[in-house]
Amino acid sequence: MDKQWFPAAGILLAALLVVSASTLTLLSTNEDPEQFPSAPGTSAQQSSRILLGILTDVTGGINSVEREPEALGRRAGGLSTEGAGGQESPSMPGPSGRVIPEPIPSALTTSASDMASQPVSSGADPIEEIMALGTLETITMSSPQPSPRHESEQKFDKVFRLCGTVPASETLEKNVASKPAWHLIKAPPPPIFSRSPHLLWCTPNSTVYIPVPAWRDGHSRPEASSSVPLAPSTSLGLPIFPWMPNILKATESLLPASPGRSGLDLTSQVGSRASENTVALDTGPVSRGTSVLLLPSATSPSQASSLHSPRPSSASPLSASPSPAALSFFPSPASILVLVSSVTTGASDSPKAPVSVIAPSTTDSFIKTSNLGPQIALQPSHPGLWLPTSPIHMPTLSLQHFSSPPSTAHSSGFTESSVHADPTLASTLPHPGQDMSLQDLSFSTGGRSHTTHSVTFRINSNRFTKAVWNLVPLERWLLNRLICYQLRFIYQEAFPNFRNVSTLLFRPGCPEVKASLIFGPPDPSSIEILWTLYRKVKSSRWSLGYLSLADHGLSSAGYSMTDLTQEIINISFTLMRPFLPQLLLPSSQSCILLEKQTIQLVTHEVSRFYKAELQSQPLLLFSNVKEWVSVYMEYKFKSPIPIRLQGLASHLAHHITDPTLQKSSIMANGEKADLVFYEMWLLILGHPFTKTLENKTSSECQELRGLLTRQLTSVLQPLKNFGQVVVEEFHQEPLTARVQTAFFGAVPAQAIIQDTVLQALGSLQETEGLQLEMLLPVLGTPSSRASRGPRGGAMLNLQRFTSLFVLVALCTAPPFINKQALYLS
């Protein structure tokens, strides 16, 4: 009794499916043949074939129950012929010629096929499919574009199916803006891989958004979604993710199709440390605009599981449909990966698609990594670091590998190869000793109006070499983006004709990085490019972002730091103003303001001394020297100059009149100004000593120093060859001030200096109420003649007479008048 109604139920179900398929076929005939169905699964005509395949499976199941395979098989064959309009069923024949029914499709397959079979008008908006993830059996189909004349003659070239298992609690959304044609994917009935493989979607070269749930240790993250925009005009449309194995690219032309088989037969294996799953691609003719997108596995805890990227408002329609392809998974200990993609050039006579191949490595070779530019944010599946869910602009990497370097070698020891390598070269896997680079294909070829220059620098980090050798870890992605961003920022600010950073070349086991820069006309010189990077890196305390660089590893196209030092001058001096910690931050307001003032103060005099035009902005550094601001500057000129010309320090000391610049501290190209110093100690009576006077940054110290400096300068300035008065410091018990007076060349007689200073001290007592006594004058040696001894016994010992002068001053001083001293800020 339980089995008697099965034939009737099967017949009713078959009739219902045939009616639905016939209706959909009739509706699809009214559509424009040039339009592709918007569903990512199938077209309307292909949906009928899928339904007929499902019908065959259901009928086969009923046959096994009722033990009537022959009768029901003939009935199902008749229904298939009637519903498809004379077209063949996609069922696979067995060895004996008998149709072998496939396993009954899951609910996901049936629902996806039903949804994909709905007719879509040419002006309809992109639809959104929501498929619950259970035991996933994804079926996609593709056939040549239907022709209105020979529609009944169309057949499948190749069909296949990909089976995979993902958690049933997750949700997979696919938003497809264009209308591509899809391939039928079939897999061998017995799954022979040990764990769930990565889902492989064969998509046209358009913007496809595939939100994928993020898995971490078996826990789901429903909010994690992704969209992967595929670049429409790149030489290789293969996004590479951190969980993927080492992927190397060798550009090859497709082989001609063999008789009885359409397209190229490529069988290869893929493997890594974490997995020995293998992918074999069996493709037909690859059309333009086709790319392969690999999605992460749901069960691999060591692989990244989601991508994040904002969705654009619209997507461009497709220009070509993808070609059939076949996939199969099988394990193998030794593995290589073959990825097939096509080049989208936009021209009708575009070359054939390149083939990416990996093979075991046996020789030293050179690797390039291409930065294709889609916006991708990675989220690792392993415990620990989690990235924010907000999008991050990350490059899509593919590796380019060449077994032999070019004939020309660079001075830095790097070797470079063209983006389009010789297809006859054997590709090998990387190993220590190879060179590897990241390449941005948007400007990989400069063209006639562009030129390429290179710069090399060293990174002071032991972790750097370890991160670089792992070909596709997250650290490499972040490192690539950081370096490219910093270099673009530096050169875009200095050169309006700068275009892009095309290549980053890494040497495993070595901290050197070589960057290729693209410039438009006019072409800058290599020494200018080196100077620009040197100025920015040194002004940032030898850092590039958060990377610390070595101070001896910069070079550009054969020019090293030794060559650069031949064309620059350096100047250092001290500004007698309190040092602020903000001056160590180049972007702080205090640093920007002081930098502007200093450049205006010095640049004009430097240009006037050499009578030459300077190269852009100088290098400027601030540091702390005894609580004052120490300034270090470097200038480069646009034309060669006699940089060893002496006298620049004396020229600056004569012509810079800013009282805050300490003339005795000026040094240019290792040369000091030609000055002679007259030093004296002043005893300050009636003024209490406080600890704040020992701090040069305190307001009390600055007020008292300013008062003494102005008063002494006013009385000493009329003297011949007067240079500057500097109150160096204050000492306690008793309160004394050390004062240094600088003169250019010959110094006036000591008696004249003492008389002039005594006049200034009397004036201070009358105007400010300060009583000062000059303890001991000391005549020093010229700063530019340090080897010369003191003049004629003029150097006296201060320690011997200090107590005597203090005693005399205290005994002979008049009664102290309590009067508030007026301090000038």
UniProtKB/Swiss-Prot annotation:
Leader sequence segment: 1-21
UniProt feature, compositional bias: Low complexity: 302-322
Keywords: Signal
Annotated region described as Disordered, given as residue ranges: 66-97, 299-322
Tissue: Expression is restricted to circumvallate papillae.
Source taxon at top rank: Eukaryota
Protein's name according to its UniProt entry: Taste receptor cell protein 1
